[in-house]
């Protein structure tokens, strides 16, 4: 039996972070965590691109274009959608996730979902460097591992 598992040091890989500008205080912290994690794991600064989009709704179309171009081994999607008084939150969060899944299934380029879907801004703060860690950093770790794993699979 052969066991496959990714590690955190894919050689020569380029990464792109696609991040929404909405809730910038939160998303800036997520981007910082992701960048720090990539660099801490041997990815050079010049092998990381950051693309800012208006909101989470726009992440899938940009991820799709980037995946088709093929310059990046993985796409790290970051954003923050906060529940409001209407169902808009559900549509944005759900369809953003579906769009990202569609991109990775159609292109074979991993699209890691670090888009927070939270009840309130306090929940987001806890996940952007607070008591629940930094989900941007965690998403970057998953990207590193997936790139390595996909390189190893037959």
From Swiss-Prot:
Sorted alphabetically, which keywords does the UniProt record give? Riboflavin biosynthesis, Transferase
Could you say which residues bind (2S)-2-hydroxy-3-oxobutyl phosphate here? 85-86, 127
Enzyme Commission number(s): 2.5.1.78
* Entry-linked InterPro entries: LS (IPR034964), LS/RS (IPR002180), LS/RS_sf (IPR036467)
Q: Which GO terms describe its cellular component?
A: cytosol; riboflavin synthase complex
Keyword Cell inner membrane listed? The answer is no
The active site consists of 88 (proton donor)
Reactions catalysed, as given in the entry: (2S)-2-hydroxy-3-oxobutyl phosphate + 5-amino-6-(D-ribitylamino)uracil = 6,7-dimethyl-8-(1-D-ribityl)lumazine + phosphate + 2 H2O + H(+)
Name the GO terms of the biological process aspect: riboflavin biosynthetic process
A GO molecular function annotation here is: 6,7-dimethyl-8-ribityllumazine synthase activity
Broad class of enzyme this protein falls into = transferase
Residues reported to bind 5-amino-6-(D-ribitylamino)uracil: 22, 56-58, 80-82, 113
Q: How does it assemble?
A: Forms an icosahedral capsid composed of 60 subunits, arranged as a dodecamer of pentamers.
Q: Which family does it belong to?
A: Belongs to the DMRL synthase family.
Chain's role: Catalyzes the formation of 6,7-dimethyl-8-ribityllumazine by condensation of 5-amino-6-(D-ribitylamino)uracil with 3,4-dihydroxy-2-butanone 4-phosphate. This is the penultimate step in the biosynthesis of riboflavin.
- State what protein this is by name: 6,7-dimethyl-8-ribityllumazine synthase
Query: Which organism was this protein described from?
Result: Xylella fastidiosa (strain 9a5c)
